UniProtKB/Swiss-Prot annotation:
One of its GO terms (molecular function) is dihydroorotate dehydrogenase (quinone) activity. It is found in: Cell membrane. Binds 1 FMN per subunit. Its EC number is 1.3.5.2. Gene3D superfamilies: Aldolase class I. It comes from the Archaea. This is Dihydroorotate dehydrogenase (quinone). Pathway: Pyrimidine metabolism; UMP biosynthesis via de novo pathway; orotate from (S)-dihydroorotate (quinone route): step 1/1. One of its GO terms (biological process) is 'de novo' UMP biosynthetic process. FMN binds at A67, G68, F69, D70, K71, G91, N144, N177, K213, T241, G264, G291, Y312, T313.
Amino acid sequence: MRPYDIAKPFLFSLPAETANKSVHRLLETVDGTRVADVMADRYTVADERLAVEAFGHTFDNPVGVAAGFDKNATIPETLASLGFGFAEVGGVTAEPQAGNARPRMFRLKADEAIINRMGLNNDGAIVIGERLKNVDAPFPVGVNIAKTEHVGTNEAPDDYRTTYEHVAEGGDFFVVNVSCPNSEGFEELQNRDAMEAILSELQDAGAAPLLVKLSPDLPEPAVEDALDLVTELDLDGVVATNTTTERPASLRSPNAVETGGLSGKPIENQATEMVRFVAERVDVPVVGVGGVSTAEGAYRKIRAGASLVQLYTGLVYRGPSIAREINSGLRDLLAEDGFDSVEDAVGADL
C-alpha cells in the first residue's frame, strides 16, 4: 500500500478546496529541505528517452502539472521533486482576485473527476511576478495569463499585457488563457478578432514562447479560426484543452449537478480527440491536458500528437507518485512499440 492510500481517506473527508490547501501547505514546508531531496530520489524517472524539446526548452520528461494546481507559484521546486518535467503556474491576473463564493470545488469520486468554479482566485501579477523571480526550479515553469474579472473585451489586450510584464522575468513560457469557463467575459475572448488582439498585444510586448489554451467546448469552426491564428501569428504552441462545461451522461456522482468546469477521467477521450484535431492542423508543439492519470492515457495523447501532457485531477486521485508511475509506464510502452524516444512517438497515430 502506498502512503497516499493511507492519507487519501482523511483528505477526501475534507472539503475539496480545504484538502487542496492542506496539501499545498505540506508541499511548501518541504521545499528546500532534505525531504525534498528524498522525494526527488523516490519519484524521478531519469531516462533520456523521456526527454522532449519543445518551444526552445528541454523537458526531462513530458509529464507536467497543469495550471490551477499551483495558482500562486509557491511550490514549483517541490513539484520538480515529485518527478514532474514541468509546471504551469496560475492563472495569473493583473490584479489580485478572491474568486467565486465557496464552495467552489467538488469531487466526483465515482467518476474520478472534479468540478470547479474557482473564478481565477490568485495573488495578482505583481506578487506572483516577484515570487517567480526567486523560483529556482530545475525544470521549465510556464505562466498561465488570464483576464482580470472586471476588465471588458476591448480592454483585455492591455490587461493581458500588464500581467505579462509583471511575470515576464520569471516565466520560461507563457500560456494565454482565453477559455476559463468560471469567470465572466471569457466567451467573448474566444472569437477570432478578440483573440488576435490579445495575442498580438502580447507579441508586441515580447512574450515568448507564447502558447494559447483552447476550450473543448468551442465549435469546430471556432477552433479552426483559432488554429489559423496560431499559424498566422507564428505562435509557439497550443494547450488542448481547458475544463468543459458539458456533462457526459456517464457521470454517476451526485456532485455532477454542480456548475463549473469538469476535469478528470470523464473528459479523457474528448481531450485526446481535441489534441488530435489540433495536431493535424498546426505545426507547433501541442500540450495535451484532460483526464491524464495513467501511462496508457498519456501515451494515447502523445500518439495523437501531444509533445507534452499535463494533469491536475489525476494528482488529486492518484497522489504524489503519479509522475513516476506515468513516466515508468511510458518508458515501457515506448520499448514495446519500438520507439527510441517520446519524441519518436509524437503523432504516431495521425
